[in-house]
Design a protein with these regions (language model features):
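Small-molecule pocket liners
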Residues: 17-19, 24-29, 33-35, 46, ...
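Short, well-ordered beta-strand segments
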Residues: 5, 30, 55, 101, ...
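Hydrophobic hinge/microswitch elements
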Residues: 1, 8, 61-120
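Alpha-helical segments flanking ligand/cofactor-binding loops in enzyme cores
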Residues: 20, 45-47, 91-92, 148
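A late-sequence structural motif
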Residues: 36-37, 98, 120-156
Length: 156
C-alpha cells in the first residue's frame, strides 16, 4: 500500500481519493521516424487512420484519450497492434515501427535518446480538457503527520 501516488487524474475521481494537481501535460501522437510501412501510412496528406496500427495503454486517462481520438476521427474498429501497461513501452514499440501511439509528451521527453530519436510527433493535443498530472492520497490518511506535511506544500 502506497502513502501517495503520482498519476493522471481520471475523469471520475473516487470519493475516497484526494487529488492535488501538479501540472497540465501535453499529449502527443507519435509515429516511427525511421523508414517503415507505418511511417509510409502516416506520411500521406490524409492518412487512413482506420488501417494504421496503434499501440495503446491498457487502461487509465491515456486509454480514454485515444478512445476519444478514435471517435473524433470516426474510427469504429481501429487496428490495435498491442495493448501495453506502460507508456515507456509504447515509445519503444513505436520506435521499432510497430505502430503509432498517443501518450503524454513528458514520457517521450524522458525516453532514452536513441529511442526518442526514432520517433516523430504527428500532432499535439489541442483539447479543451488538459491531461492533469497530480498527487493522489486516500482522504482518510490526510491527517497523518507525514502525509499532512507533504500535502500542505503542494501547489493546490
Amino acid at each position: 500500500e502506497a502513502d501517495l501516488a503520482i498519476a493522471g487524474k481520471p475523469e471520475t475521481l473516487p470519493g475516497a481519493v484526494a487529488f492535488s494537481m501538479l501540472e497540465n501535460l501535453a499529449v502527443v501522437l507519435i509515429a516511427p521516424a525511421l523508414p517503415c510501412p507505418v511511417r509510409n501510412q502516416v506520411s500521406v496528406d490524409k492518412p487512413d487512420w482506420s488501417t494504421v496500427p496503434f499501440i495503446m495503454a491498457d487502461q487509465g486517462p491515456v486509454r480514454r484519450r485515444i478512445e476519444l481520438w478514435f471517435r473524433r476521427h470516426k474510427i469504429s474498429n481501429p487496428q490495435i497492434y498491442a495493448t501495453v501497461g506502460g507508456h515507456e513501452a509504447m515509445v519503444s514499440m513505436v520506435a521499432l515501427g510497430c505502430g503509432v501511439a498517443l501518450l503524454p509528451e513528458v514520457v517521450l521527453e524522458n525516453s532514452p535518446e536513441p529511442v526518442r530519436n526514432r520517433v516523430m510527433i504527428l500532432e499535439r493535443s489541442d483539447e479543451k480538457t488538459p491531461f492533469e498530472l497530480g498527487v493522489c492520497a486516500q482522504k482518510k490518511r490526510l491527517h497523518e503527520p507525514l502525509i499532512d506535511a507533504f500535502w500542505k506544500i503542494l501547489p493546490n
